Amino acid sequence: MKVIEKVEAIKQQEITATENLEQMYSTIEEKNDDINAFVQLDIEKARKTAEDIDKRIKNNEETGKLAGLVIGIKSNINVEDFIISAASPTLKNYYGSYNATVINRILDEDGVIIGLTNMDEFAAGSSTETSMYGPTNNPKAPGHIPGGSSGGSAAAIAANMCDITLGSDTGGSIRNPASHCGVMGFKPTYGMVSRQGLLDLAMSLDQIGPFANDTTGIGLMLNVICGYDPYDTTTINKQPEDFLKDTTNSTLEGQTIGVVKEFMDITDDKITSQINKSIDDMTSLGAEIKELSFEDINLGLPTYYLINYVEFFSATRKYDGRKYGERIEEVCGAEVARRIEIGSYISQKEFSGKYYNKALQARSLIRNEFNELLNDVDVIAGPTVPKLPHKIGEEIETMDMYAYDVLTVLANITGIPASSMNSGLVDNIPVGLQLQAKPEDDHKILSTMSALENN
């Protein structure tokens, strides 16, 4: 049953919100000890919400777009009365005193928030191994990482623990785990979704987005969370369109799909072979394939990390142990410490022009060149991650870990929308097809996903 079909079934009283919740909770109880997707639950509060929805439906009262759907939230998004730790001992006792804008919008539409999902500490990672709660296990490839930093949110969907989850994406943190876990993940255009209430990693790169098992779940959640927010001045001040319409009767007839040569060249051969099958599927559905070249791909990771380091260093200065929590440098893990140290170095006045300003110049160059590529096509398609996920606990060099994001950081640098959906299996492990489009062309990506999903 697709997500939108479940909402209709709940509203038509074919199933109840309470039944849906209890089924999901039973799955969590059965699987979470092994998977560690959820790090915090409030089942009693969720039950009260579900019971209220059922009562209103029974009384023929109006209910919201998400009526009765079970929702999981990444642990760096403020939800009142939950511990918003960002999986770090720095904030292990910090209770959210307010709801992020996206949370209020979910609750206003009768979503049932069941709990918070695991993640890399402060979203600084690509494996969900750096969490103070321990690593998350990949439900689709047991023993392997689920990707990160939103690994718990992806794993929860892959294990059918909830209907939709939210994650945040700084350089691939939604798309990377969506690829490894074989689910759908969507990073909207920068500014399409409010970041108010997000404990951000890098403010100019971060974006909140959904995970689901089908495009109706993605479209439904985008309809709820997208839109202008006066509390976040980076949000786009225009009414977003109905994303659900892009999940029905979608076609690739007359569409031009770009394939970037360099994206394929740096990807493992087995993954490239599988991605080519998805591209062949697009051709059979009526799309024209156009080969593109992006020679500045090697600029992506260094540009991204220079910006990331400086913005992360700035964002973490408030965690000084004075108002709440611990001083971050005294309790954080190795990856967070590394980023703080490098960010501090780059931020020193005598170096700011040498590194950070150069990174901003490179960002403008990348944005301009990538947008030129997108002018000639509707969507760019290619692999989400260039290699398969490693095994949990396997020693891996820092730069090899960073390389997981080489194909995803470009969307954050440029602010464009991007998604990942399952392309197939390589060595019995899911690999994702990444789709990217021009800013505010989120609907083109969702329509392409739907055409592939339904055909």
From Swiss-Prot:
UniProt xrefs under InterPro entries: Amidase, Amidase_CS, Amidase_dom, AS_sf, GatA
The UniProt record lists the keyword GTP-binding: no
GO terms assigned for molecular function: ATP binding; glutaminyl-tRNA synthase (glutamine-hydrolyzing) activity
Top-level taxonomic group: Archaea
Active-site feature positions: K74, S149, S173
Keywords linked to the UniProt accession: ATP-binding, Ligase, Nucleotide-binding, Protein biosynthesis
Key word NADP present: no
GO cellular component: glutamyl-tRNA(Gln) amidotransferase complex
This enzyme's EC code(s): 6.3.5.7
GO biological process, one term: translation
Catalytic activity: L-glutamyl-tRNA(Gln) + L-glutamine + ATP + H2O = L-glutaminyl-tRNA(Gln) + L-glutamate + ADP + phosphate + H(+)
Protein family according to the UniProt entry: Belongs to the amidase family. GatA subfamily.
Function summary: Allows the formation of correctly charged Gln-tRNA(Gln) through the transamidation of misacylated Glu-tRNA(Gln) in organisms which lack glutaminyl-tRNA synthetase. The reaction takes place in the presence of glutamine and ATP through an activated gamma-phospho-Glu-tRNA(Gln).
Listed NCBIfam families: gatA
Oligomer status and interactors: Heterotrimer of A, B and C subunits.
PANTHER family assigned: GLUTAMYL-TRNA(GLN) AMIDOTRANSFERASE SUBUNIT A, MITOCHONDRIAL, TRANSAMIDASE
Name of the protein described by the UniProt record: Glutamyl-tRNA(Gln) amidotransferase subunit A
Species the sequence originates in: Methanosphaera stadtmanae (strain ATCC 43021 / DSM 3091 / JCM 11832 / MCB-3)
